[in-house]
Design a protein with these regions (language model features):
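N-terminal Rossmann NAD(P)H-binding glycine-rich loop of SDR-like oxidoreductase domains
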Residues: 14, 22
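Substrate-binding pocket helix/loop in short-chain dehydrogenase/reductase
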Residues: 82-83, 87-95, 187, 191
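Active-site loop-to-helix junction immediately N-terminal to the catalytic Tyr of the SDR YXXXK motif
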Residues: 86, 134-142, 154
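Active-site helix of classical SDR
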Residues: 106, 144, 152
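Alpha-helical segment proximal to the catalytic Tyr-Lys
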Residues: 111, 156-161
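Short, small/polar-rich loop/turn modules that mediate ligand/substrate recognition or access, typified
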Residues: 160-164, 221-223
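Short C-terminal tail/terminal secondary-structure segment
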Residues: 211, 222-237
Length: 237
């Protein structure tokens, strides 16, 4: 549901995909609370409110809005190392940010998730194409995001019909997390060549899909992982 009575809670909404989503929602929402460690480039005006928060920290999470129609968890990690090079701390950090942070976020949100006008509330999580596609150097993040997908499906069953919950599984999206991978024209061209659509993803690509999953247009979609990967996972050209 997207409209003048809607309230959204976006974790990690001050950078990358989360920031782009906040910009897309800002013109049509009553309130958008953004939980993140810093405001960064966040446009704190109109319905947008920044609440300092570290979802992986020791402190209790802030009190969420009284009624939430849409919640999105954007924090993630890009920790591309060989299995041999990964330490247990690497696995633990990826697990804490991707899964346990999402668990804490969802536990805070659940009592406040309320649909309007007969529509369920909607939750969007982020996975990665590397869960379904075996990729080298992705074992830690793929393990953590695979757990996110399992969590999402379980909660989709548990929370229906009052709440829908889905996940987006992107391939490479041009965000600050991957800036070193796209730091030269040559690197960008090489990355783009891996995809049937011959470009890397943009924050607008991912945010637009998240916005769709928050809207009534996706009202019969729950428990799904939606690929956003330029055709990588299904197309061979």
């Amino acid at each position: 549901m997207i409209g003048p009575v809607t309230t959204y809670l976006v974790a990690g909404g001050s950078r990358g995909i989360g920031l782009e989503l906040v910009r897309m929602l800002a013109g049509s929402a009553a309130r958008i609370d953004v939980w993140s460690r810093s405001a960064d480039a966040l446009p704190i005006e109109g319905p947008v409110r920044h609440v300092p928060c570290d979802v992986t920290g020791p402190d209790p999470l802030p009190d969420p809005p009284e009624s939430i129609q849409g919640a999105v968890y954007c924090p993630g990690t890009v920790n591309l190392k060989s299995f041999r090079a990964l330490s247990e701390d690497d696995f633990r950090r990826d697990w804490e940010v991707n899964l346990l942070g999402a668990v804490r976020f969802l536990k805070a949100c659940q009592p406040r998730l309320k649909g309007v006008d007969g529509e369920p509330a909607s939750v969007v999580l982020f996975s990665t194409v590397a869960v379904a596609q075996g990729m080298p150097m992705h074992s830690s993040v793929a393990a953590a995001k695979g757990a996110v997908e399992g969590l999402m499906r379980s909660l989709a069953a548990e929370w229906a019909p009052k709440v829908r919950i889905n996940a987006i599984a992107p391939a490479l999206v041009d965000t600050p997390l991957v800036e070193r991978m796209l730091s030269t024209p040559e690197k960008r061209e090489a990355m783009a060549a891996r995809y049937p659509l011959k470009r890397v993803g943009t924050t607008s690509d991912a945010a637009a899909l998240a916005r769709f999953l928050l809207s009534p247009e996706s009202g019969w979609i729950t428990g799904q992982v939606l690929g956003l990967d330029g055709g990588m996972s299904t197309v061979r050209v």
